[in-house]
Each structure stands twice: as structure tokens, then as C-alpha cells.
């Protein structure tokens, strides 16, 4: 083959558009998409793992999971709730009749 024919058979590749000197929009889109995916991954990690890990670590400090308070206020153990019995029932009061009461 002569060089002139081989030049005609090669595919023509378009030249790139001139850059405007700023950040390309494809790069901005790529960063936005990766940030969004990273945020979703962090949220799912918290939802599935970190929340339970926080509860386990708080329970190991001597608190039960019912007493957990996220903040500064601590649980007051000096005044426990008394274990009172329910008042005795007065028998079957019967059906509720409006206006008799």
C-alpha cells in the first residue's frame, strides 16, 4: 500500500473543543455524584452498624439500653420509681351508661 491510500483508510478523529480555562462540567458532575454516593454509604453504615455499636458501648458503661440519654443529662438513680401495687378493684362496675355518672 502506498502512504496516500493508508492515510485515506484511517478513521478521522475529531479534535477536542477548546477549553474555557475553568473546571469542566463533567468533573463537577463526577464530584457531585461521588459525594452523593459517599453520603448514602455513610448513612447506610450508620443505620446498619454504627447505631448498634453506640448502643453496645453505652450499655457496657453500666447503663441499660432503656436508660440511654444522648446528651449531658444523666440518669438519677437515687430516686427509683417505687413498685406500688394497683389499687384493689371494686368488683365489676358493669357497663358504661352515659349520663349516670
Curated annotation (Swiss-Prot):
Protein task: Involved in the viral transport within, and between cells.
Cell location: Host membrane
GO CC terms: host cell membrane; membrane
An annotated GO BP: transport of virus in host, cell to cell
UniProt membrane topology term: Single-pass membrane protein
Subunit structure: Interacts with the capsid protein (CP). Part of a MP-CP-viral DNA complex.
The name this protein goes by in its record: Movement protein
Region (Disordered): 1-22, 79-101
UniProt keyword annotations, A-Z: Host membrane, Membrane, Transmembrane, Transmembrane helix, Transport, Viral movement protein
Segments passing through the bilayer: 30-50
Keyword Transport: yes
UniProt cross-references to Pfam families, sorted A to Z: Gemini_mov
The keyword ATP-binding appears for this protein: no
Polar residues: bias regions: 80-92
Sequence similarity: Belongs to the mastrevirus movement protein family.
InterPro entries found in the cross-reference section: Gemini_mov
Source organism of this protein record: Maize streak virus genotype B (isolate Tas) (MSV)
